[in-house]
């Protein structure tokens, strides 16, 4: 039986191998000097909070790196929250840390850590929509939030990766237009599914840009 440290190291290794198969993985992750959980923020499974950058000729991917770490304490029979989240966007030159795309995936990752068992809700509903604060895009709601839909499937790489204890989902976070968000808020489950289907039909379903035409 593997020790916790061996499970942790193996999970990190397998996640890195997965992203290296998708594109060029930046050698350094983005992480805090002081862990936000020490200042009252959400606690990630192994405490470690990091983000990986993956570059392809056509897109840049920014992904959480740690939501699927094995839990440091308690039940270690599964890989953390059973998921990582990512944003896919047009190529970004240099550091991604000060971009709205990073803000989007950062807020999503913190929400996943705070809520805990989001993966079960995704398995039940397929898609989830939510709103985030502190994402610096030109269009926001009157509440100062942006809308996003979680769970649109990638057609260019696998949506799951097998780690040391189980398979975990790589969950896309896609920025919504105000019209799309409003339609979902007005129409509930039916509206969410319709917008998801329209986004898939539009093409580049997992890509987040500010220039994309609204499907509503």
Question: What is each residue range found by the language model?
Answer:
Residues 1-63, 67-70, 74-80, 86-216:
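Acidic, proline/glycine-rich low-complexity IDRs
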